[in-house]
């Protein structure tokens, strides 16, 4: 039962909401007279005038700015509250209790209680308001050309009408028998039916609006598919004339849609796809023009490369449009769902295959269609998508899909041969292929093999290993910390994937680091195998198993620290210079036509560019999978950009070859060159976001010292070329550090931090040119010792400036290079807490200067301060009697005791309780003392566990269920308020934005939770519910539907709160020093949870 919040239909729903409020008012006034009821009726606005004003509320023009909102789905952007949403007001209007929720409680409390008053007057007004709603709905159906809307909307309208009749029947029954229990139940069922029917009505309308946008997108896809068969300039002009207005409509419609979505991820995907389309469209047209010019009147050198560029851009445009179509149809966003997830990849592939099915069937149905046409390519691409699904499906599904792919490919090859030779299709190959395609992709009557594989993969479910090394390390440590917990092998699988990633990283390292990393992996695998063997034999809690667990924990932490260090080194080396290979390639492309080595130089520079791109994309993927970042957004951005760089590299080489032999195609080459350069810079930026800035600066300093040693060797050997290369690398690394410092300063609003970093950056900026100039002087005269000494002095100053930048960014001076930085990161993760300062008063101290402060775990400790003299013994006095201690309330102890009574269930049996446990496991590492965010989040986890009990009918009443959901909403409001307050005081712009984005969804989800809980309360204990046409039906199906939506909403809420806590903990280290905000993040020792 999705609940929507739309401006479009607000005027239609408002009368229904208002009239149901008056029904409630009359239900609560047992002594109300008929005159008072009539008085209430006369105070209402004129419903007929209201209906006429709302008659066109469902028009396309108005609805485009008022897309509805779902319970679990993507929603309009504004935060939902009780005052703005008429549907919410049906459940939770202004006042102590909501309309339907209050009726539920009245029904529950009225066993043999007070009599109900005469409700025929207000119920009659409800009927008239519902009648206006139904009239507008039917008018919308009559004027729409959407057959699905015309099919789905009438049952929803009939359901609302049937529920309204139930209200009328209940009011007449209560008029004759004020104590009638069945009449009271009809009253509740009628109100609930109106709500559910109205929600179904709005769902139909919103899906119709989405289909309108999708139709425009598919029309654009049809035009793009034609681009591969255009062979004349006249056809190209007509193509541009036809596709331009379609792309304009797509841009406008998608832009209006994304503005009203609440999910930041969905908005960003739509914006990114539209930006890509705006960039690709002119490049596609230019590549089409180039391919036509090089192919007319006969193909010239570079024609094949131009066609490859055109086809690539056409495919890119199609993929971006398919991604828009996919996101437009999304109704939920699961924060735990990664783009590399098998289910997500399968869903994308199925959506893309369905979009190609019509073109494929049209080609098969046309006996005169040529081989190589758009339809045949559609069949080939469907097979590619099917193969992608089979690679991720269950074994039995994969086998069926592969068999179908083989049959379709064989039939298509035979059919192409027949048509190329002009022979008829006597064996009905086209019909057989069409039937196989429908069986594979699905049709109106069947889900198809690909759809079945997707459903089975979703049903197989279970938790998947994390997608980053940090996440897998966390899963493995959680498995080791909970020996009695059956995680289905998740922890062991995460551990093995972690070591597999480490071995991939080892291939990129020098022999010394490679051997150490491989040795760590071998030790971990050996210990894991021993532990798994002990658990299989039932000895998982033996002393030997505990000893192995401790060894594994230490080895895993060492592995994580070592991977982070060597990965940062790889980023420093591979991304130090991203422009030189590209610059040299461009120079090779523009070489003099009469240069005899022109072709060979182009091949060499192309190979160097390809190798450099492969090195960067490989390192970037390792950063995404093995790096310290847990941010889904950052990791996905790295993977997406790395794939684009990898795809664009051969296209840039093709465009360069075209330009090499055809100087007139300069614009075509510049278009792809610019796109490739932009992708490179984006990739470097995303990689920089994924690694620690302080670690990067320290690693850069170490690399610069290594190149300094190479320069010393070049000076001693009078190697001018080696000196120039190594000193240039030092300068490049210095510029990288300078760019990083400038980014850090731009991202902060803390005046002292910005000033400190900018001063260090200015010092570094001034130190680079002297070092480079002195290196040039040595290169001109390698035996000039005076110039060598000058170079050493300027280079030392440069290295000191780099260290000063690292000190300014981290806030901690490093005396021993980068080693201290890693020691600091280790100490931050340790549970050690320094003892509180002594309460004794220091009366006298011998005069001695204090020593330099010692840096330890970000605390400054002064040593060698003599202890104060021992005070005299106290005089014996008779102290007054000690008052009795006040009763203490230990919230942490109460929380621990609560979760001991609620053990972790199987997620498939009690998913709401499992979601509450998931949040609790995230929060139990933090103390709630002096941290209101953690305290409120812990209350939410406990309340959600209680709500799980209530919705399963395990004790409590309907009133308890409704009140519990309201308490959860109140706690979520507190979490959001505190998170927004913290975000306003955060000086880090990126952290502040991330915190605001993850917290903006909580109020909407919490409001929806109250609505769903009320709907669930109306179904508890009910044998029957109201069917689509007002008839009573068995309630199992609708009750299951309501329960599933409530479960999904609860899971989203718990996940959102967990994300807010993580973002708040990260943002807390960057709050304004003069804010006065007190928010302690005190990590609890593990033993305190037992």
UniProtKB/Swiss-Prot annotation:
Q: Which residue ranges have biased composition labelled Polar residues?
A: 817-830
Record's keyword annotation contains Magnesium: no
Enumerate the residue ranges of region (2 X repeats).
339-561
The primary site where this protein sits is cytoplasm
Domain of life of the source: Eukaryota
Q: What does this protein do?
A: Involved in cell adhesion. May be involved in the attachment of the actin-based microfilaments to the plasma membrane. Involved in ovulation.
Family of this protein: Belongs to the vinculin/alpha-catenin family.
Q: How does it assemble?
A: May interact with sorb-1.
| Name of the featured protein | Vinculin
Organism listed in the record: Caenorhabditis elegans
